[in-house]
UniProtKB/Swiss-Prot annotation:
Monomer. Interacts with CNTNAP1 in cis form. Binds to the carbonic-anhydrase like domain of PTPRZ1. Interacts with NOTCH1 and TNR. Detected in a complex with NRCAM and PTPRB. Interacts with TASOR. It is a lipid-anchor; GPI-anchor. Belongs to the immunoglobulin superfamily. Contactin family. GO terms for molecular function: cell-cell adhesion mediator activity. This is Contactin-1. Residues 41-131, 137-223, 241-326, 331-407, 413-500, 504-601 form the Ig-like C2-type domain. Residues 1-20 form the signal peptide.
């Protein structure tokens, strides 16, 4: 009895020790001795950097964390490497998400990460920063006014208030919200510091300016006190050279980001801004703003690193600025870890490699805790090595995580999941591999037998390291039963299969080479012998790729007449169909192949290596390399061009005019100066015109002086003491260089000396000359020519125009007003005798409005009355009339006052019956009583019209009823409204027809309500 108790105690102690050891292994990490479907945590959502607006009304912020695991994971959070006390009422958990109530900058700003764990291990999320965003208001102090001479450059400082983060956007208000300044070549708002730059100040810049700052991160905007800008007039503005005042600094950018460089110059005339990458072509993703002041490079790459230059130039001088863009890269995986199962006692090298700039360092976590740095190699693994591993690659720009679970396997050999095939087929003379793949850990030893004979390696037989059996040069005697025996320290197992030998597959009719022209057909023959017990399939491939006959049935067809025939028909062959065709005859056991080449003759392929050299104003030299002639000699080349003005390619004139097929250089001539071009080259042979080359890089031809004169020169009219000159602006293609503008020359018709003025806006077609001594309607000769930095163009034809007339000096007389209704009056007057009257202007305003808010109506000079509509009822109005012409309006007439009538009745007549009587309907309604502020009812208007039409017969009556004829066909509408001195009131209507007396809605409403007995007649 004592021995039995002692034995039981030892068993219990041993069981507890084993159980505790098993539990320790199961806490973090897992050894597998049987099928295991559980797994450790895998993150599906991780926290991200979050900015919480300090003024947010929400009062809480969430950091997300969600992992998939079996069993379900448990979550906890850490901040600045310290555990978060989730028992505090400031924190709560929703699933794995952390919710912070009433966030406090002093307590809650920091770095957070989430831990997810189950009995397979623990993983740590990526780190996320919680910060607090704010944008303070501008100081309340008034900003001093700025005075600048016209023609001089200037800067208005924004001086944004304290803020976080830095991603502000800037705009400037002019005089009031929301009138924002539009940026152009003369005005620029820097998104770096918010300042407003004006290259040269004009009189039109006068106003009050305010810097408007927005923070997209916290959706808040503020604006500064207004800054008065006062341009000081100059008799003549002085030109001065370009001076770059907005300069970009060296930039460190991450690969994939968008980079913005700013460059703006002061100067008079307004400088042109050009960008280039020093010694290298500009990135293909670079874009330059319309004004030229901003260069944006989208999705920047490592090869975009380099020195960038901005050059500003006007006709007084140029300025340059350079800085470097350094492109670095966030860590990116080259090779990372994945969930892995390894046999107990084996070695493991777990590769984890990342690239980036700077080169990332590698560190490891195991179950959420620091474990190792650099390469990870495990030797003679045990269950203690199981768990959740994380490889972290990090550089100065951030970190990336790769998570994986390591399971340790210890299993006796078993073929339950992957037994050997019961029947294995192999062709005589061929090769076969019989797989033996049991599940076992550690790796077992392998033995093979055929029948009762043990197999060993020989010249024909090879047992692979993974246990597979390879037999070469198969004979009929190799058929039989094969068994694979496996054993490790956990147990033994075996599996058996039968090898059956078949006849080999052989090509007996091989395809032969063919030579055709584009559009012709070709046939590739193919036939094979094979084991009659098997099914034969033919597979055709083209240049190594299997032909998909479903997708490519337009050009490829097969002959299915005979099982042993795999003939291929190629229809309407194109150049792309030239190449090597391979026929493969295959069964489930073996295959045999044969190939042939197809030559397709056709138009030439695209020329290559196109280069542009010796760029001049109207010509460029091109060189290229010969492309494929597709088996027919090239007879000539054609150069084609495309400009920014059109998307169409056009044949260019060349020198020589005909480019022979043996040439690889020519010159494109008769080009437009200072125009952006692309070029391509097309080859031709006797079989047609080939594909064009890849277009060249865009180039700009050299500048030249304009050689086209503006057209449609004319003008005249305008305000008093003005000479207005107009012309049709030259389109962009005729500018020929930068700083394009116009020189306008004019003189009195009989004068000797031409007066010349310069107009710098290339898009304008108008100039107004003001001269207080100019006489009205004076004849002038005018002409216009274009200019740029290369020189002047020819003058246009001379046109004769007249200066503006004087405004009329007389006021209209006998102005009278007739009140028509509550919303309309009629105004009439005596005409002005002066011949220079072109129109009359009637100004009118209500007594409660200011005269400055007066409405205006313009009528032709032949009219002596006007109707004013949409007036307010029962309101006093003031009216005056002026005579006008192109120079302006003359003095006003005496002011006349009048009162509009009271408003018409607002209540519609209530129709009480619609009764048929013989051949007519009698419509009856209640009397409308006007309110105290409405005009008295003087009668009623009745409109009798077909339904769906606006016109009909109008009746007037003082009664409360009317008789209308019965419609012969269709429905009619009877509209009734009260009439008064103030106009017509609101309408009531009823529908009638030859078949019914009331609309259904009125019939159902009126008869019960009024107790009217109506006889229906049909």
């Amino acid at each position: 009895m004592k021995m039995w108790l002692l034995f039981s105690l030892l068993v219990i102690i041993s069981f507890k020790t084993c159980l505790s050891e098993f539990t320790w292994h199961r806490r973090y990490g897992h050894g597998v001795s049987e099928e295991d479907k559980g797994f450790g945590p895998i993150f599906e959502e991780q926290p991200i950097n979050t900015i919480y607006p300090e003024e947010s009304p929400e009062g809480k912020v969430s950091l997300n964390c969600r992992a998939r695991a079996s069993p379900f994971p448990v979550y906890k959070w850490r901040m600045n490497n310290g555990d978060i006390d989730l028992t505090s009422d400031r924190y709560s958990m929703v699933g794995g998400n952390l919710v912070i109530n009433n966030p406090d900058k002093q307590k809650d700003a920091g770095i957070y990460y989430c831990l997810a764990s189950n009995n397979y291990g623990m993983v740590r999320s990526t780190e996320a920063t919680l910060s607090f965003g704010y944008l303070d208001p501008f100081p309340p102090e008034e900003r001093p006014e700025v005075r600048v001479k016209e023609g001089k450059g200037m800067v208005l400082l924004c001086d944004p208030p304290y803020h976080f983060p830095d991603d502000l956007s800037y705009r400037w208000l002019l005089n009031e919200f929301p009138v924002f300044i539009t940026m152009d070549k003369r005005r620029f708002v820097s998104q770096t510091n918010g300042n407003l730059y004006i290259a040269n100040v004009e009189a039109s810049d006068k106003g009050n300016y305010s810097c408007f700052v927005s923070s997209p991160s916290i959706t808040k905007s503020v604006f500064s006190k207004f800054i008065p800008l006062i341009p000081l007039p100059e008799r003549t503005t002085k030109p001065y050279p370009a001076d770059i005042v907005v300069q970009f600094k060296d930039v460190y950018a991450l690969m994939g980001q968008n980079v913005t460089l700013e460059c703006f110059a002061l100067g008079n005339p307004v400088p042109d801004i050009r960008w280039r990458k020093v010694l290298e072509p500009m990135p293909s993703t670079a874009e330059i703003s319309t004004s030229g002041a901003v260069l944006k490079i989208f999705n920047i790459q490592l090869e975009d690193e380099g020195i960038y230059e901005c050059e500003a130039e006007n006709n007084r001088g140029k300025d340059k600025h350079q800085a470097r863009i350094y492109v670095q890269a966030f860590p990116e995986w080259v090779e990372h870890i994945n969930d892995t199962e390894v046999d107990i006692g084996s070695d493991l090298y777990w590769p984890c490699v990342a690239t980036g700039k700077p080169i990332p360092t590698i560190r490891w976590l195991k179950n959420g805790y620091s474990y190792h740095r650099g390469e990870l190699r495990l030797y003679d693994v045990t269950f203690e090595n199981a768990g959740m591993y994380q490889c972290i690659a990090e550089n100065t720009h951030g970190a990336i995580y790769a998570n994986a679970e390591l399971k340790i396997l210890a299993l006796a050999p078993t073929f339950e999941m992957n037994p050997m095939k019961k029947k294995i087929l192999a062709a005589k003379g061929g090769r076969v591999i019989i797989e033996c793949k049991p599940k076992a850990a550690p790796k077992p030893t392998f033995l093979w037998s055929k029948g009762t004979e043990r197999l060993v390696n020989s010249s024909r037989i090879l047992i692979w390291e993974d246990g597979s059996l390879e037999i070469n040069n198969i004979t009929r005697s190799d058929g039989g039963v094969y068994t694979c025996f496996v054993e490790n320290n956990k147990g033994k197992a075996n599996s058996t299969g039968t090898l059956v030998i078949t006849d080999p597959t052989r090509i007996i009719l091989a395809p032969i080479n063919a030579d055709i022209t584009v559009g012709e057909n070709a046939t590739m023959q193919c036939a094979a012998s094979f084991d009659p017990a098997l099914d034969l399939t033919f597979v055709w491939s083209f240049n190594g790729y299997v032909i998909d006959f479903n997708k490519e049935n337009i050009h490829y067809q097969r002959n299915f007449m005979l099982d042993s025939n795999g003939e291929l028909l190629i229809r309407n062959a194109q150049l792309k169909h030239a190449g090597r065709y391979t026929c493969t005859a295959q069964t489930i056991v073996d295959n045999s192949s044969a190939s042939a080449d197809l030559v397709v003759r056709g138009p030439p392929g695209p020329p290559g290596g196109l280069r542009i050299e010796d760029i001049r104003a109207t010509s460029v030299a091109l060189t290229w390399s010969r492309g494929s002639d597709n088996h027919s000699p090239i007879s000539k080349y054609t150069i084609q061009t495309k400009t920014i003005l059109s998307d169409d390619w056009k044949d260019a004139k060349t020198d020589p005019p005909i480019i022979e097929g043996n040439m690889e250089a020519a010159r494109a001539v008769d080009l437009i100066p200072w125009m952006e071009y692309e070029f391509r080259v097309v080859a031709t042979n006797t079989l047609g015109i080939g594909e064009p080359s890849i277009p060249s890089n865009k180039i700009k031809t050299d500048g030249a002086a304009p050689n086209v004169a503006p057209s449609d020169v004319g003008g005249g009219g305008g305000s008093n003491r003005e000479l207005t000159i107009t012309w049709a602006p030259l389109s962009r293609e005729y500018h020929y260089f930068n700083n394009f503008g116009y020189i306008v020359a004019f003189k009195p018709f009989d004068g000797e000396e031409w007066k010349k003025v310069t107009v710098t806006n290339p898009d304008t077609g108008r100039y107004v000359h003001k001269d207080e001594t100019m006489r009205p309607s004076t004849a002038f000769q005018v002409k216009v020519k274009a200019f740029n930095n290369k020189g002047d163009g020819p003058y246009s034809l001379t046109a004769v125009i007249h200066s503006a007339q004087d405004a009329p000096s007389e006021a209209p007389t006998a102005v009278g007003v007739k009140v028509l209704s509550s919303s309309e009056i009629s105004v009439h007057w005596e005409h002005v005798v002066e011949k220079i009257v072109e129109s009359y202007q009637i100004r009118y305003w209500a007594s409660h409005d200011k005269e400055a808010a007066a409405h205006r109506v313009q009528v032709a000079s032949q009219e002596y009355s006007a109707r004013l509509e949409n007036l307010l009822p029962d309101t006093q109005y003031f009216v005056e009339v002026r005579a006008c012409n192109s120079a302006g309006c003359g003095p006003p007439s005496d002011m006349t006052e009048t009162f509009t009538k009271k408003a018409p009745p607002s209540q519609p007549p209530r129709i009480i019956s619609s009764v048929r009587s013989g051949s007519r309907y009698i419509i009856t309604w209640d009397h409308v009583v006007a309110l105290s502020n409405e005009s008295t009812v003087t009668g009623y208007k009745v409109l009798y019209r077909p339904d769906g039409q606006h016109d009909g017969k109008l009746y007037s009556t003082h009664k409360h009823s009317i008789e209308v004829p019965i419609p012969r066909d269709g429905e009619y509408v009877v509209e009734v409204r009260a009439h008064s001195d103030g106009g017509d009131g609101v309408v009531s209507q009823v529908k009638i027809s030859g078949a019914s007396i009331l609309s259904p809605c009125l019939l159902g409403f009126l008869l019960p309500a009024l107790g009217i007995l109506v006889y229906l007649e049909f």
